[in-house]
């Protein structure tokens, strides 16, 4: 495999891996800092599309970077939560949804279907507390655009909470649309999802996703994503908090890690698999903690790939995360293979 230098202004990470595989080991820590001078042409970012020296670096492994002249950020205009860049914001002024909830509601055994462009099946606003049980949720649209609005703000996600709490239990979520995340928590949204199967088929369609400071708690999920830039456990600008316990999380698309972290994410007792990407990517001032998790990644051997590590910590200049030290810890579970952590 052709190896290239990872392009970044500053890359700093703290790594803690202990008790991996069948043979337990004492936890170790390491800190790495890399600075590349401006007189060498930047190499592509992990799993990004390559370019010649006249082109901008490729995209990060999950989610497209915003344009540097646009500088999109969470709508409060501040630094956002962990992983939130500074700068101004261009969040949507409204969202489209088939079923929009602004008052407290509980429903059981219903089906929610969305076929419109960049439209959600379920949307939670105005501080509503909504519980959906034993549900079926389908999101299908050939006209959806995906892109930054889907990655940063949740546009077109099957289930989206922007202000209020959403509890999902015992359901099935399927999306076949660009930008069709399974479950998305943004801003003042709080999502709890359990005992649910989530399948996404198109690009920019994470399984469970937080951004803009959202909060999401997941337990015993079966998640499969198939598109590019579609991590099974995904976060983006503005970060947030995600806690995952149990379940299987599989990403099959190119440039789609099992976990893409621009937030504070904790995962316990889960199986994490990326079939065409590094298993874990942590960007900037953010953290990922794994306990008793199996971890598997697989980067195809071709000259477009910068590295073949299972776990990568890096800093891009896209503005998708605040510049700072990435933190990764792994206690128990299976050892990252074949090459560990970069």
Regions found by a protein language model. Name each.
Residues 1-11:
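Positively charged n-region of N-terminal signal peptides that target proteins for export
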Residues 15-19:
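C-terminal motif of bacterial Sec signal peptides marking the signal peptidase cleavage site
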Residues 23-93, 317-319:
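Disordered, low-complexity segments in secreted/periplasmic proteins that are enriched in proline
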Residues 41, 45, 49, 56-60, ...:
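A detector of tandemly repeated sequence units and domain arrays
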Residues 65, 74-91, 136-162, 180-187, ...:
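Acidic/polar low-complexity surface segments
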Residues 83-144:
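N-terminal segments that cap or nucleate solenoid repeat domains
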Residues 104-109, 129-135, 166-170, 190-196, ...:
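All-beta strand scaffolds that present successive hydrophobic residues in beta-strands
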Residues 111-114, 136-142, 172-175, 197-203, ...:
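Beta-rich extracellular carbohydrate-active architectures
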């Amino acid at each position: 495999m052709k190896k290239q230098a990872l392009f970044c202004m500053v890359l700093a990470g703290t790594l803690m891996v202990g008790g991996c595989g069948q043979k337990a080991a004492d936890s170790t820590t390491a800190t790495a800092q890399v600075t590349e001078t401006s007189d060498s042409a930047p190499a592509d970012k992990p799993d990004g599309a390559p370019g010649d020296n006249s082109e901008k670096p490729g995209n990060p492994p999950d989610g497209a970077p915003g344009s540097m002249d646009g500088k999109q950020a969470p709508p409060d205009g501040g630094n956002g939560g962990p992983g939130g860049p500074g700068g101004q914001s261009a969040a949507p002024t409204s969202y489209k949804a088939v079923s929009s909830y602004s008052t407290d509601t509980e429903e059981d055994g219903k089906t929610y279907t969305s076929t419109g462009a960049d439209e959600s099946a379920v949307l939670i606003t105005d501080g509503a507390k909504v519980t959906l049980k034993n549900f079926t949720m389908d999101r299908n649209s050939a006209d959806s655009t995906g892109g930054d609005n889907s990655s940063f703000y949740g546009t077109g996600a099957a289930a989206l909470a922007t202000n209020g709490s959403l509890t999902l239990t015992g359901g099935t979520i399927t999306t076949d649309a660009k930008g069709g995340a399974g479950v998305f928590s943004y801003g003042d949204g709080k999502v709890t999802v359990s005992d649910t199967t989530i399948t996404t088929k198109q690009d920019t369609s994470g399984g469970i996703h937080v951004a803009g400071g959202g909060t999401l708690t997941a337990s015993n999920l079966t998640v499969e994503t198939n598109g590019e830039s579609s991590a099974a456990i995904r976060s983006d600008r503005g970060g947030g908090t995600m806690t995952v316990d149990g379940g299987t999380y599989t990403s099959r698309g190119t440039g789609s890690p099992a976990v893409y972290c621009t937030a504070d994410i904790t995962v316990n007792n889960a199986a994490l698999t990326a079939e065409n990407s590094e298993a874990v990517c942590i960007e900037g001032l953010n953290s990922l903690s794994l306990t008793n998790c199996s971890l598997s990644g697989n980067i195809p051997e071709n000259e477009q790939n910068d590295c073949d590590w299972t776990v990568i910590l890096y800093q891009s200049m896209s503005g998708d995360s605040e510049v700072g030290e990435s933190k990764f810890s792994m206690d128990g579970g299976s050892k990252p293979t074949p090459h560990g952590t970069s």
